[in-house]
Curated annotation (Swiss-Prot):
It comes from Neisseria gonorrhoeae. Oligomer of 12 subunits arranged in the form of two hexameric ring. The keyword Amino-acid biosynthesis does not apply. This is Glutamine synthetase. Keywords: ATP-binding, Cytoplasm, Ligase, Magnesium, Metal-binding, Nucleotide-binding, Phosphoprotein. GO terms for cellular component: cytoplasm; membrane. Belongs to the glutamine synthetase family. The activity of this enzyme could be controlled by adenylation under conditions of abundant glutamine. L-glutamate binds at residues 268-269, 325, 331, 343, 363. It is found in: Cytoplasm. Catalyzes the ATP-dependent biosynthesis of glutamine from glutamate and ammonia.
Amino acid sequence: MSIKNAVKLIEKSKARFVDLRFTDTKGKQHHFTVPARIVLEGPEEWFENGQAFDGSSIGGWKGIQASDMQLRPDASTAFVDPFYDDVTVVITCDVIDPADGQGYDRDPRSIARRAEAYLKSSGIGDTAYFGPEPEFFVFDGVEFETDMHKTRYEITSESGAWASGLHMDGQNTGHRPAVKGGYAPVAPIDCGQDLRSAMVNILEGLGIEVEVHHSEVGTGSQMEIGTRFATLVKRADQTQDMKYVIQNVAHNFGKTATFMPKPIMGDNGSGMHVHQSIWKDGQNLFAGDGYAGLSDTALYYIGGIIKHAKALNAITNPSTNSYKRLVPHFEAPTKLAYSAKNRSASIRIPSVNSSKARRIEARFPDPTANPYLAFAALLMAGLDGIQNKIHPGDPADKNLYDLPPEEDALVPTVCASLEEALAALKADHEFLLRGGVFSKDWIDSYIAFKEEDVRRIRMAPHPLEFEMYYSL
């Protein structure tokens, strides 16, 4: 969509406001809202100059001594917000550093743009396609509190396995999925059909093509909405829009949606499998006549991801909660291997009917990942594999959780904690710096920023510690 078409959308919808959105390092969207008349008074100038804001108020960004930042709207992203009472056109923005007029080196969307530019400049390909699958839970309610004398959380979900013995307005229907029993049953066990359909209707209205929606494995209403792939920056934009729609539709239904990887103990967590392929001159470079129909280029791309996986974990699995999901036997891929069939491997090659659909699927990321950063980092790791012809070795076509100890010890794993992942990123990040995609300043500031998460968890007594140690 051009500036001209964005202006037409504002005029045709009779929008009262324009909502400018951007994403911080953690992956959370922020927004500033301006009256639509300001845009219409001089659209070309407004789209060029954007909106100034205080960058020091965004965690992990500028200090207060040099905090001026600029939002530059991307007209191609404009859509009418489906939730606001007053008609409002939403536009996603790049964050610009006024010092040089370029994308701020800590702005996730600018990093993603630089990754796309680096792919083209490398000569390897001209387009990278990404197709994430963010899973999520929808609960009836959640309570949590942390204080110096009290720490607790409690999830309320009529569809949770733990609710079988509860009185619910004097009646308990009994229809709910068991632990690990939530995958695609019909109603009344699947109580989220209408909710998901409402989400899908809005997503399709925003131009995000939905391919399927269904309940997922976890009890307590775990869900997935599968959407079509797109180019890197566009697909990251759509992932942010998806999260916004999912959380707001749930809110309007009187429920609460979360993308936490592991909100429920003892059941499957939520991942964000990321499908990827590289194209050049209209040809899929991952299609070939090798293992599972892959080309050498695709195998080298896999090799790069496996080589750098522990460093990638700091970006693709950026929360302390991420590593409560990445444990064996909960359908979470912990083994750094690849396979055409084996879902215990961290890289899977989906079965497809066409060479155009040939792709690889990274299964270890989760939806707390900032999509701009995660997709850019995965691409950079894969490109390093292609550039240096890093072969991933033989595929792993047997259950990696059932290997004998001597074989199991030979298969590398993803990180076991955020602390380990940050240490890996500190030691292995040169591949991210190529083409100026990520900066050394970003690496250092990101590690320091996320180490605060590690510190907070390390300093907080856990209720399980009282169970295990209080009476010793």
